[in-house]
């Protein structure tokens, strides 16, 4: 299977939803993607979440993560999923426990694609494989020592200074233009449908976000930075809440309020009856939809939102 699923990790930061939405005790409809947003929110808050995705394999990935946190300790789940350093023997052993939590069709899928399990499921999506390849080139170019020094910085101010002195180089901009050219990125890194509204240089846009990626949040708390540049999360404090020991008890208590469904948000909203939501997290679905379709969805959401 060339691309079993597009995203191993949600590209949306759950902190955005947590800060922007009045979520405690509410009902949220969101895009499932890699599962980090709904799983992290349910680990910290008592609420109801319905997470939907047009891809059945994204849903299978999310249910695998649910099975992992229900049957393993947090540090074991992190290793099993691929956040921690590679350990194929441990992952195979852990999968024997996780398998008992999976629906029959999901179990058959993962057994057919067992190499995804042994290699770590989060790093074997279309997007992650592409970006991790690019990041390995980047780290080889600037030196792993510099990345480790930055990851160990104690403040964002130090990260700013270090980035401008040691990492900001003209060749990096050229690399971004190549790696994120629509012809290459739209085939290997992302489904081309997600670029239908793209205007201007995608590589330049990514480059402008590049410095923020390194300097806008404390590196020790940024699991995206650590995972993409080093291939694993270095500091446990950076792991998503659903993989942290501090939230494990509340996660197990609240997870009954979380469901995953293979369905589009458009279809879910269209067929709402008595069930209404207090909050919606739509991710970047507008990138994949025509304007008229998105306008129709937003109009329907406004009419059917519980206030």
Where are these regions (language model features)?
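A short glycine-rich, Lys/Arg-flanked "PGG" loop and its adjoining helix->strand segment in the class I
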Residues: 293-307
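Conserved alpha-helix/loop element of class I SAM-dependent methyltransferases that forms part
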Residues: 5-27, 36, 294-295
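A short acidic, Gly/Pro-enriched loop at the edge of an enzyme's catalytic core
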Residues: 23-25, 263-281
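Class I S-adenosyl-L-methionine-dependent methyltransferase module
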Residues: 57-249
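Conserved acidic E/D residue at the C-terminus of a beta-strand in Rossmann-like folds
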Residues: 51-56
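Conserved beta-strand positions in the Rossmann-like core of class I SAM-dependent methyltransferases
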Residues: 29, 50
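A short SAM/SAH-binding and catalytic strip from SAM-dependent methyltransferases
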Residues: 99-104, 277-292
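Conserved SAM-binding loop of SAM-dependent methyltransferases across substrates and taxa
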Residues: 34-46
